[in-house]
Amino acid sequence: MAAQSAPKVVLKSTTKMSLNERFTNMLKNKQPTPVNIRASMQQQQQLASARNRRLAQQMENRPSVQAALKLKQSLKQRLGKSNIQARLGRPIGALARGAIGGRGLPIIQRGLPRGGLRGGRATRTLLRGGMSLRGQNLLRGGRAVAPRMGLRRGGVRGRGGPGRGGLGRGAMGRGGIGGRGRGMIGRGRGGFGGRGRGRGRGRGALARPVLTKEQLDNQLDAYMSKTKGHLDAELDAYMAQTDPETND
């Protein structure tokens, strides 16, 4: 039954040429010579360059383009001042002695009330939270006020304070956060004054050597590289050392 169900297939249009011969003949007929390829590419480039030249000529003849070419200025004339400091203003890491907050001027930063710190005779430097002067207490988040201190128009009134020159973001001055009368303000954590450096009215007002801008910047970088826990530990140690009565 299998032999009966498989009829014989007869192909009428057959050829004795092999596939290799057939494709070889097709390749010979279609392949152009390299000389023809180079000639065609040069012809296309010449046509494109002619079009570009015509387009450039048309653009030059336009009145708007001619007016723009007449007003052509040099790069310095168009840019104006090339001094970066003149355009950006005072650099952030400026020397702080009178640079950001002068003698007796408050610094207001990061959402502090407009009243700032009023009262007292020394420069008040305040960052996000507040400070008590003469190293008595730290107002964390503005929720606590040091004892023996009165409020005056939304600020703190103290007996001493940090020394000359306020501290802003990236600047240093004489009397900020730190140990015994020198240091910096870091990362908006609040600050306190150096011990007795309020214009020579406190305890132990000492003469300090004047530091250069590079030394102040190096101290600031070293301070800002410390972690929050390290700063809190230093602050607690300083508070316990300067005014042990607040721990009672």
Curated annotation (Swiss-Prot):
Motif GAR motif in this chain: 194-203
Chain positions with Phosphothreonine modification: 33, 242
Effect of residue 203 to A: Loss of 5hmc binding
Region (Disordered): 151-204
Pfam families, A to Z: FoP_duplication
Tissue expression: Expressed in an erythroid progenitor cell line derived from peripheral blood. Expressed in glioblastoma cells.
Subcellular location: Nucleus; Nucleus, Nucleolus; Nucleus, Nucleoplasm; Nucleus speckle
GO biological process: chromatin remodeling; in utero embryonic development; mRNA export from nucleus; positive regulation of ATP-dependent activity; positive regulation of helicase activity
Top-level division of the source organism's lineage: Eukaryota
Effect after changing residue 199 to A: Loss of 5hmc binding
GO MF annotation: an example: methyl-CpG binding
Modified residues (N-acetylalanine): 2
Any one annotated GO CC term: nucleolus
Modification after translation: Asymmetrically methylated by PRMT1. Symmetrically methylated by PRMT5.
Major localisation: nucleus
Keyword RNA-binding listed: yes
UniProt feature, compositional bias: Gly residues: 157-195
Modified residues (Phosphoserine): 40, 49, 64
Keywords: Acetylation, Isopeptide bond, Methylation, mRNA transport, Nucleus, Phosphoprotein, RNA-binding, Transcription, Transcription regulation, Transport, Ubl conjugation
Transmembrane helix among keywords: no
InterPro entries: CTOP_PRMT1, FoP_C
PANTHER family: CHROMATIN TARGET OF PRMT1 PROTEIN
Self-association state and partner proteins as the record states: Interacts with PRMT1 and PRMT5. Interacts with the 5FMC complex; the interaction is methylation-dependent. Interacts with FYTTD1, SET and PRC1 complex members CBX4, RNF2 and PHC2; the interactions are methylation-independent. Interacts with ZNF148. Component of the transcription/export (TREX) complex at least composed of ALYREF/THOC4, DDX39B, SARNP/CIP29, CHTOP and the THO subcomplex; TREX seems to have dynamic structure involving ATP-dependent remodeling; in the complex interacts (methylated) with ALYREF/THOC4 and with DDX39B in a methylation-independent manner.
Functional note: Plays an important role in the ligand-dependent activation of estrogen receptor target genes. May play a role in the silencing of fetal globin genes. Recruits the 5FMC complex to ZNF148, leading to desumoylation of ZNF148 and subsequent transactivation of ZNF148 target genes. Plays an important role in the tumorigenicity of glioblastoma cells. Binds to 5-hydroxymethylcytosine (5hmC) and associates with the methylosome complex containing PRMT1, PRMT5, MEP50 and ERH.
Name of protein: Chromatin target of PRMT1 protein
Organism: Homo sapiens
The encoding gene: CHTOP
